[in-house]
């Protein structure tokens, strides 16, 4: 969506691909899906991914190659969920993110507990622009509570949000020390 709540398609950025791949690898995420159905955007993602997986970047920066091992490009949310179901042998819990709360909002602590204690896989979806439509979001099991900073401003880049959320869900439990 855009700021007028119109359905749009946002552009993939090189930085988002890199930074989310690196954060996902740091937090031992099994699979990072880039979901896009526009051919020109898919081509951009494929170019970036192949540069780091098999191209010059794979030998120039082997750490970056490692970060791209678990990156997959798919056409739709449904395709990503189907791939996880096939790989894991069961349907995942699907949780999305938003800067607003909903009836099915879940806390970080609750989702972290599910990740640690349940065998069922979890898919966490992130949107770009002004997020996904309300209708799309209502199709999922949960919506993670918003990230609240110290002030009133609440519009993070997707790569910032991914890093913060991965740390809350998969990072060291420093508060237990």
Range-by-range predicted roles:
Residues 95-136, 146:
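Long, charge-patterned amphipathic alpha-helical coiled-coil/hairpin "stalk" segments used as oligomerization
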Residues 1-99, 163-176:
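RNA substrate-binding interface of SAM-dependent RNA methyltransferases
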Residues 47-49, 108-112, 138-141, 159:
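Short, glycine/charged-enriched secondary-structure capping and boundary segments
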């Amino acid at each position: 969506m855009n700021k007028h709540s119109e359905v749009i398609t946002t552009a993939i950025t090189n930085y988002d691909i890199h930074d989310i791949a690196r954060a996902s690898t740091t937090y031992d995420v099994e699979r990072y899906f880039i979901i896009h159905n526009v051919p020109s955007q898919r081509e951009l993602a494929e170019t970036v991914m192949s540069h780091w997986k098999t191209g010059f970047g794979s030998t120039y920066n082997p750490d970056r190659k490692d970060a791209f091992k678990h990156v997959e490009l798919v056409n739709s949310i449904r395709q990503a969920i189907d791939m996880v179901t096939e790989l894991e042998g069961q349907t995942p819990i699907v949780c999305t993110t938003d800067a607003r709360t909903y009836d099915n909002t879940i806390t970080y602590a609750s989702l972290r507990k599910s990740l640690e204690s349940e065998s069922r896989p979890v898919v966490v979806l992130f949107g770009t622009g002004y997020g996904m439509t309300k209708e799309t979001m209502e199709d999922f099991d949960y919506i993670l509570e918003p990230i609240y900073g110290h002030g009133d401003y609440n519009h993070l880049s997707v790569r910032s949000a991914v890093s913060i959320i991965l740390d809350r869900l998969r990072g060291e439990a420093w508060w237990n020390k």
